[in-house]
Every structure is written in C-alpha cells, then in structure tokens.
Amino acid sequence: MEAPTPLLLLVLLTTITFFTTSVADDQTAMLALAKSFNPPPSDWSSTTDFCKWSGVRCTGGRVTTISLADKSLTGFIAPEISTLSELKSVSIQRNKLSGTIPSFAKLSSLQEIYMDENNFVGVETGAFAGLTSLQILSLSDNNNITTWSFPSELVDSTSLTTIYLDNTNIAGVLPDIFDSLASLQNLRLSYNNITGVLPPSLGKSSIQNLWINNQDLGMSGTIEVLSSMTSLSQAWLHKNHFFGPIPDLSKSENLFDLQLRDNDLTGIVPPTLLTLASLKNISLDNNKFQGPLPLFSPEVKVTIDHNVFCTTKAGQSCSPQVMTLLAVAGGLGYPSMLAESWQGDDACSGWAYVSCDSAGKNVVTLNLGKHGFTGFISPAIANLTSLKSLYLNGNDLTGVIPKELTFMTSLQLIDVSNNNLRGEIPKFPATVKFSYKPGNALLGTNGGDGSSPGTGGASGGPGGSSGGGGSKVGVIVGVIVAVLVFLAILGFVVYKFVMKRKYGRFNRTDPEKVGKILVSDAVSNGGSGNGGYANGHGANNFNALNSPSSGDNSDRFLLEGGSVTIPMEVLRQVTNNFSEDNILGRGGFGVVYAGELHDGTKTAVKRMECAAMGNKGMSEFQAEIAVLTKVRHRHLVALLGYCVNGNERLLVYEYMPQGNLGQHLFEWSELGYSPLTWKQRVSIALDVARGVEYLHSLAQQSFIHRDLKPSNILLGDDMRAKVADFGLVKNAPDGKYSVETRLAGTFGYLAPEYAATGRVTTKVDVYAFGVVLMEILTGRKALDDSLPDERSHLVTWFRRILINKENIPKALDQTLEADEETMESIYRVAELAGHCTAREPQQRPDMGHAVNVLGPLVEKWKPSCQEEEESFGIDVNMSLPQALQRWQNEGTSSSTMFHGDFSYSQTQSSIPPKASGFPNTFDSADGR
C-alpha cells in the first residue's frame, strides 16, 4: 500500500482540527447557555454530553435544534448562542426569560426562531442580519422590549414565510422591503407603535395574512395598496388612522376576513366588495363611509354602525343630487372634511360648501376652493343641472377640465385658478366667467374669444363666430378695456410723480439711509387676537400707512412696483428710537423691540445683529424674505415685512401680546400670570404640533426648525400658540434622509444624533417637541442646574418616570388640578412625549401623528373658534395695479371660503387658506 502524501495528510489533519474546534465551540456555547438559565433544565450538566440534554438535537456532534418551550425558564439567553453555526431551530417561547435578545447574525443555517411570550427588554442591533435561510421569526408578546424599529436587515432573509412581531413595542415607520420577501405569507405586527403609511412594496408581495391593527399612535395614509395584494386572505387594519376610500379588492379572490373598523375611511363601499364570493367577515364600523348603506350577502358577518350613510335601509340608493356630489368628492379622494359634513340624503339641508336655490331643492353653488384638495375634477359635476357657481380654486388638482362642464346651461362662474391642471382649455359660452389664472402652468392656451389666456378671464363662445352683433360687442368691450388700462397707467404715473415730489419736500433723508420694506397684509386670526400686525383691519391698515392724512410725513411710503420704500426713521419712530424700554427680548440673531403705529397697531421689530448675519449677501437675504412674506399658517408667527439700511437689516413681525410659553410655565408667578390650565396646555401643544407638521410635510417643501423650545412658542390673547424664531430653519432637500449642517439650537432640546453628528432630519424637531411636552407636563425646564445631577436633565429623568405609570402623577406640575378624566389625557400626552424623545430617530413618530394624538384631547373642550385666516402679500415683481386687482378679487371671494373648525384627524384642517399665487411653503419669525 502506497504511503499517503504529505498534502493529503495536511488536508486530513486540517479537517479533523476544524471539526474538533467546531464541536468544542458548540460545547462552550451550550455551557454558557446553561449558566444563563436560572435554573437550567435538570439534565443540563457539564458532566454529560450536551447532545444528550433535553430539548437539544445534534447532527454529527453539532447542535441543530434547541427546543425549550413552556419550561418556566428564567434568566437570559447567553450571547454565545450566536456561535452555534449549524443551528437550524430555536424554540424558547412561553417562558420568563428577560435580558436582551442576542444577535443571531450570520447563522446562515438558522430557519426558525420562536421566542414568543417572554419578558425580554431589548433586541440586539442587527440581531437578524445575514439569516439567509430564515423561514419563521416569532417574537410576539414581548411588550417589555425597549422601543425598537422593524428589523430592516430581514431584507436578506428571502426565504421568510412568517413574521410575528405583534405586541413587541416596535415604533416608527415600516421599511419598504416586502417586495424582496417573495415567500412571505404571514405578517403580524399588531399592538405596536408603528406610524406612517403602508409600504408600497406590500403590493408586490405574496402576503396572505396581514395583521397590522391597534397601533398606539395609529398608521395613516390610504389603503390603496391592498388592491395589488391579490393573495390576501385576511387583513386586519382596524384601530388606526387610515383615510380615503376602500380600493377595488375584486382581484383578492381568497379574501375572507377584512377588518377596517375604527379608522377614518371615507367614500362609498365599492360594489365589487359586495359581490366578493370569498368574503365571510367584515367590520366597517366607526369610520366615515358615505353613500348607500351596503347590502352584503346573508352569509357575510357584518358590523357597520357609526358611519355617515345617506340611508338607513341596506341597498337603498341615495338621491341623484347626493350621488353626484359624492362622485365629485370621489374625484378628490373623498376628503374627510367633506364626509363629516355631507351627511344624510338632502344636500340642501346644511351641507358645508353647498348653497341651494330659494326652494331648497337644487344646488346652485359649490364652493370647494382653498382647501388644498388633491385629485381631479369629476365630470359628474355636469349632472348638477342648476349649478351657477363652481369654485375649485386654491387646491392641488391635476388632470384636465372635463368638457362636460361646457354644456351646463345654468353655469355662470367657474374658478379653477391656482391648481396644477393641464390639457386643453374648454370653450365655455360667453355667459360663463371662467378663471384659470394664476397657476395651471401646463394648461393649454387655446381659450375662447372672450378673454386672453394670459388673464384667465371669461372665455368667449365656441369659435367666436356667432354673428356681426357679437363681433361689435367684442370690439366695444375691447376699446373700453384699453381705455381703462390706459387711465390706470396714467393715474399710477401721476401718483408716483406726486409722491416723489412729497418725499423730496418733506423727507430730507440721505438715500443711503432709505430702506425697503415688503409688507404683507396678515389678517389676525384666533391665534393672535388683537396682537397681530394687521389688528383685524386687513387692507385698511395698508391704506392708513400710505395715506397722506395718516400723520407724520415720515410714515408716508413710496410704492415702487410692489415694493414699499420707507426712511429708516419710520422704524426709529415706532420703536422710540429703539429704546431700551421697548425691548421685548434678545437672542443670538438680534434684539426684538415693541413698535406701535399711529393707528395703535402693535408690531415687533427685530434689529438683526451684523455678526449674526455673517456674509449673507443682500440678494440672498431678499430671496429668503420674498418667500417668507408670501405664506401663512395660523400657528406660525407672521413675518410682515423687512427694512434694509446699509449693512443693517430689520424684520417686522406680528405682535403676540401674551409673551412666550416659557414665561407661563417657569416665570408665571414673577410676571403676575395665572398658571396654565391643562386645557390651555394641551391646546398649546396641539397648535405647536400643527405648525411644525406644516413645516415638515404640508408645505411644498420640507423645512426643519432646529430650535423648537418654549421661548419660541408665542401666545395670543386667547392663549393660542404660534411657533416663532425661524432664523435657524433649514430646507430639507428632496430625496435626502438628512442634512449635514453647522450645529444650531439649544442644549436640552438637541436630539442625540444631531448633537453627535450635526446631521439633521425632521425627527430633530420631533425630539424637541417631546421635550416641550415634558416641560408642559412637569413645569420644569429641559436643563436645571439647581437640581441634583440625576434630575437635572428632564428627558433622562422623565423617561425613567414613564417606566412605571403610577409615578407620573408625582412628576406633574403642582399647579395642575387633575381629575380622573384629565389624568387619562395626561397619560396620553406623557406617552407621546416618551415616543417623541426616543433615542433613535426612526423610532420617533412624525408630527402628523402628534396632531392625531393631541387632537381628540382638545376636541373635548372645543377651544376657541379658529377663524378664517386669509393672507395677502405683495410680490416684489408685481405692479401696483396687479396688487390692487388681487386684493379686490380676494375681497369678493374669500368671505365664502373655509367655514368651520374641522376635525383634528384632518391634517389639512391646520392649514389656513392662502391668497392666490402664494406658494405652499412656510412663514417664519422671531418676534412677538
């Protein structure tokens, strides 16, 4: 026999060594696991072969299975379990184990993990990375786990069939990874703190059973993705904040159980759902479903109470007029605000935004303008044969203008301006006043003969060839218009000449000391009482300031193409030459002075520190101000104008008479205030949430405040709040998760990731909002050096308090008088504060969900009526006649818009209507 070669001996020796080492590693891991159990199973002894221990299976001396379910085990799971490289199945469910679930990363053979119903308090970061063979992950009912996020590393576990993570304290949004999990059939995530929308990738999955019900803060968005989930058998989405209609589920031929109760769903129950043969159980109660009461098959178990159906008899249709209006709402995605008002089977019985004839039978006006609606214009509007006026302006509508509208014989006015419509411009009869400008940049220019497409006026008749009489009328109208335009221009030139003469005669001011101020007319709303700059007078204030009879000549402004030029002395006069007595506050960006005009209107004038402005150029500064002056939100302090004088820059804001939230929380006794009631505190918190929500997600772009704190939350006479100090606002670029920036903000309110890396996302503001909530609850400052170290940092201390709910009453502001009902509200706010201050940004909710949590608490008290807030700005590129025309147009139409105080569940309800031409962005300020 030939002797083995040295190479063969080396390979054999290496193999034996590796096998021996692997077995030894398994022995070490199993002994560590035995020590971590208290006590271990009785036969788990170091003196016996671990492969013979109860619940352990081996193959070739390597551990492949650990099965210890229902053994009443205590202790924890040793991290050495991650070295069992041949492990295929772990079953340790229904025990009393605690500690952290260790990492199983890179155990490529692992197929099953069962750890349900234990007392684990955490999950190792990346615990499930690299588990390419994993089929089942079940951690249900471990609700002591510290808040964590859905493990996105599961994207590599393409063999997964089942994920059970219900009641495990998951927070944040779901990653959009489910199209990568082609084998996934069961996804159970109920009873967590998941927020955000259903990921679109669910539509490309093969999921059969989807349980995502009972999220603490509630998921939101539509459920449209269900229409693509053709493998669905069971879908539990109840107890969330989903909105919009039920999609077409006719392709889900195996769907037998659909739970949609307790959401904000709207619209008509689709007929395809009524005929779905597989359906056996459905819950629709406690939503806002509209239209006919659906008639399901007798075999289907249905709960459907507490909706807004037009009839009480199943299968009975609504009146034609109601069905038409619901079709119109359908084009807009069935907005919740319409569902709340459009109830019953008579559209003339108090439906909002609908006006009827004197007989109370036919709709003659439909006013859906200035609500930020999305969607398209439904051609069903043409079925409203008596309709005279249709307002759809100031929304975000897309698509085309239906040609059916041109055949409405009663129609006299249609306004679709300030939308994003496209396609051809329909040719309306000459009797119809048709407005489509400004906005609608993609809308065609082939309008009728009666108006220029550039003006968006009334269009002429089709073709414009109705006879010689029509042509003569057109010529006459054209001549009259030309004469009026000429006279307006002539008057403007004369006016400008006279004003320049007066300016030269009475204001011997060095041209270098003349500033420019851009003024916007901010109508005071319920949030600012009489403290707003406009003081409730609207355009009258503008006229008073510019009238020669308004007082001293130093108050006479020169209008030049929309800009208003004033001497620096005007601001000196209204602030008593920037007297120390007029100082309202100081900040890193300047000093704020109280100012009072001759008519008694109060303003706040911020004199910017030169050092704070840095090297910012004049053109950049003006570009920023041009944006800030054109937008409004009822919970953001309004910037009214600015003045530039050489290197000095001044900002003019509305005045907020009740100071800031910090004064009412921490200095109320010294300042002679009464302590805030719980009602006032929750209302203020909701106002702030709505303002910041608008910055983050409801404006055209996303903006980050970066310095949210009580001193930047200002209060009006009715104690409604507005967010101020936008000197630090950062634009969040589209498509980027975060922005690297120079550190700004205030210690105590800085999110951990921002303080550590300087990378900022909207979750930085969410963290600061959580700190403010804690201050509202406790009456304590975010940082208080007068307290012992363990209590000086509010977030750290309060999060310890939250571990035991019974400790919360002891931590509250002693001025609060809380009954049982109030305490329930306090617990909700305390819980929200904890979520907002989670250490990991992805575990924090967005501000929209803060609004949804706080809204129902405020709704109980019905706080001060939120009046309509119209906002008007003068664009720097707009001529005076154009500005005056805008004011006239707004004055004739705005009074009928935006009635009522809408439900907290509609984030759009926190957006006041804007003047036409204003972008959907944000307004900011640092004054009072």
Swiss-Prot record:
This is Receptor-like kinase TMK4. Residues 25-472 are extracellular. Its main location: membrane. SMART domains: LRR_TYP, S_TKc. PANTHER family: OSJNBA0070M12.3 PROTEIN, RECEPTOR-LIKE KINASE TMK4. It catalyses: L-seryl-[protein] + ATP = O-phospho-L-seryl-[protein] + ADP + H(+); L-threonyl-[protein] + ATP = O-phospho-L-threonyl-[protein] + ADP + H(+). GO terms for molecular function: ATP binding; protein serine kinase activity; protein serine/threonine kinase activity.
